Amino acid sequence: MEEAYRQARKRGEQGRRRAISQSEHPYLTDLDSLVAQLPLGQRENVGLRDIPLEMVVGTVTKGRQSAFSCNFMPLLPFNTEFARKWSNLYDIQVTEGYRDPVIVTEFMHRFYVQEGNKRVSVLKFLDAPTVSAKVTRLYPGTWDSLESRLYGEFCAFWRVCPLYEIEFSREGSYETLAKMLGQNLIEKWPQKKVDYLRHTFLLFKRAYLRAGGDHLDITPADAMLVYLNVYNQDRLLDTPTDIVVNRLCKIWRELVIAGKNDEDKVDLVEAPSVDEEESPAKSTSGVLNFFMGKTVYSAANPLRIAFIHEFPCATSSWDSLHDQGRQYLDEHFGGIVRTEAFEDCHDPDVFYAAVETAVKHGDKVIFSTSHRLMEYTLRAAVEYPQVRFLNCSIGLPHQSVRSYFGKMYEAKFLLGALAASMADNHRIGYHASVFASGALSEINTFAIGASLLDPRAQIILTWGDVPARGLAEAMCREGVSVMTGADMSKSLEDPTAYGLHRLIDGKVAGIAMPVWNWGRYYELIVRSLLHGTWDETSDDSRVRAVNYWYGMSSGVIDIRYAPGLPYQTRKLVQLLRNGIVEGSINPFGGELHSQDGVVQIEGFPPLPSTQIVEMDWLADNVVGTIPQTDDEPKVRAL
């Protein structure tokens, strides 16, 4: 049809000019040129498939390259044989449809046409979603680039769930999606599950594009993972499109963050502002007068804060410590701040009920005190944007929820030095219960601290949930006389293995332990709210997550000695502690060695904080390994 070809050619010219103006290739990409200098792997006959037309991006050979614009629209004049054939194919398609499939080569999750370029062009002009094709898959020759690794993950996904439409830009996403649906990447999925995912994704994609998702730097599949992480209890197929669009608008900043590079996702706030450091308790005029004129809150109009704990405070030392911090706020701020606590909220329904109650009570800030509550906290934050939510974790890139945690590695550095000063045979035990963000930095600073006092020190590393007495016996068999285990216990007289302790004749004798001062931490955060500096922490023009990461210099972390520790030893540790607080000592500055070689050479500045949080190596004097994530999934936050 003459008019159809003219319209298609017009779109082709527009696409060609747009590409030239943006310094892009104006014609179809040809696969032969694309792979000419690349190492290639084997070819695999995939067979007859319906493939997404939006993923058909080029031709196999150069022969037809200049006949089409980069958007697959025709460019040749109307009075040509090419134009007549294109028009005939158009007439066939609109009257009866094609019967024969095109022939394509798949390379890196894109398709290049061997036979049927004009048919593909006609279908794209008609906005058809798919085309029937005989597919040959061409594998890359190496798998060391991000793109090839992502393609390898896609191929593993495709073998169990043959959907081309699902494309991720982050490693590990296919496995995450499979787990969300109760599947894996090893066993073939039931056809009902494949069909469900296809229909769900297409519904979500329409809503995502309607909400303006094509302006974001993520794929629709990336966005669907973010959506499901917040609204994972809802079946998308049963949700009206208008509601999905509305929800996408609510989590828009989460979607923006998902498109950023890892180093651009999180702002680590490592020290409080000057205003936050000022202590109202030291004011001679009293707490109320100290804040007079500095805050909109008063005893008559207090800042109301809720704390949501995972377990009962009577049975969980972690939750009990946080609740002591909550009680400190009530006492410290003299009526300007009023708090309430909700315990045993590990069940999602109980958690959401607690949030609803807190909002009804007028609470403007909600702390959830366990990283395992982050999923629930994120969804609640999206539903109640007028409330400020914080979760006790580190390294999680959520703009709707701020995270807070402490630089425990500083305390572990001191404990490592202390351990080396008291070990009899250069062998020191270290037990970590969970593989978490920050765990490796704590192990490594412990090892570095030990090596400062004893260059021959070896850190015997074990992982997992092991009974304290069984762990002590196992360490004794390894010749370990000094070790560090769990960080918390109700008292130093507790006979279980906690903190740094000696192993003597099968018994435990405490040496020192790390200490959390959650009252101080909550005081610093709340003071930013009272002073009105909360919003100054992050620049609204840059959508980033905010993670508070305070350390010894802020008074939120310290160590406590057992009674009877020699004063010479305490003096040594105090010197190192002063260096940490003053900033003259950084365990991760200068020369660093891992089990695999040199991390950085002498004279180098300290590692950036983001590298410390996401550390993925062990110091050279650590005897042990990092758990395999397939066997023991890494917890993303402490």
Where are the regions a protein language model picked out?
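Short, charged/polar connector segments at secondary-structure boundaries
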Residues: 1-118, 124-125, 170-183, 190, ...
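Periplasmic-binding protein-like
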Residues: 362-371, 390-392, 480-489, 508-516, ...
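Extracytoplasmic "Venus flytrap"
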Residues: 304-324, 329, 342-348, 436-440
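An alpha-beta-alpha
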Residues: 326, 414-457, 542-563
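Glycine- and acidic-residue-rich phosphate-binding/metal-coordinating active-site segment common to enzymes
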Residues: 107, 114-177
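Segments of small-molecule ligand-sensing domains
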Residues: 532-537, 541-638
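Flexible loop/hinge segments that line or gate small-molecule binding clefts
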Residues: 382-405
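Hydrophobic alpha-helical segments within soluble ligand-binding/sensing domains
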Residues: 404-426, 515-536
